[in-house]
Amino acid sequence: MSEMMGNNAVWGLIVQSDFMTKMVMLTLFFMSVICWAIALYKLILLRIKQKQCREVLHEMRKCTTLQEVLQVASENKKTLPGYVLVQLLSHGKNAQETNSIELFQFQADSIIDDVLYQEEAYTPVLTISASVATLLGLFGTVWGLIHAFVRISEKQSADIVAVAPGISEALITTIAGLVVAIPALVFAQYIALKIRSLEHSLVSLSDKVTVMVRMSMTKQSPAVQHKSDESI
């Protein structure tokens, strides 16, 4: 019962606040909705993709040839690790033709960088929202205090009736700013940690393919040299 009365009191303070305070609260509310939507969306996707990477890496442990890797890639072509494998194998074929493992490693790094860049999409919104929400809360605090001093000047009195509305506006906007900023900052850091974990899995995938491409090129080199000697 007391909790319901407290909620009604807070809502009453928001309703009775001035236009500027309502605008700050409305902005913070929309920022909170956007941050939670982005955070849940990114966390769900990252969890799915990390699980896919673990499964593909487990299958890759059984592979000993590029042909077996190609089979794994074709079976998982609709997943993120499957897409990365297809791209790596495509560049691996070119590396075998040009006999340039350095070029393949550069291309593999570029593929992973592009994937990670896409995975980081929308996450800056969380860090920006955390900073902006804090500043909006501070702005609301200052605005509420100014409002309180204006009422003191108008009423020529510093009693609680005069200053309470301004002080309540200041405290409400401060709390609202923190309620938006803290989860946004926590989500941003946690998502960054998940992206680093995904990066580790993709690098492991790339390293496995790189080793196989290098081994394939090593096997091809003696054969090419033998054909060259025969032609001479």
Tell me what each language-model feature is:
Residues 1-7, 180, 209, 213-214:
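Feature detects long, helix-prone N-terminal segments enriched in hydrophobes
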Residues 168-186:
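Hydrophobic alpha-helical transmembrane segments of polytopic membrane proteins
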Residues 23-40, 129, 133-139, 176-180:
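Lipid-exposed faces of alpha-helical membrane segments in multi-pass integral membrane proteins
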Residues 2-58:
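Hydrophobic membrane-targeting segments
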Residues 1-10, 98-106:
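Short, membrane-interfacial amphipathic segments enriched in basic
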Residues 156-170:
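Hydrophobic alpha-helical transmembrane segments and adjacent short intramembrane/lumenal linkers
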Residues 18, 36, 69, 85, ...:
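Residue-level signature of catalytic and energy-coupling elements of molecular machines
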Residues 51-159, 186-232:
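Predominantly long cytosolic amphipathic alpha-helical stalk/bundle segments
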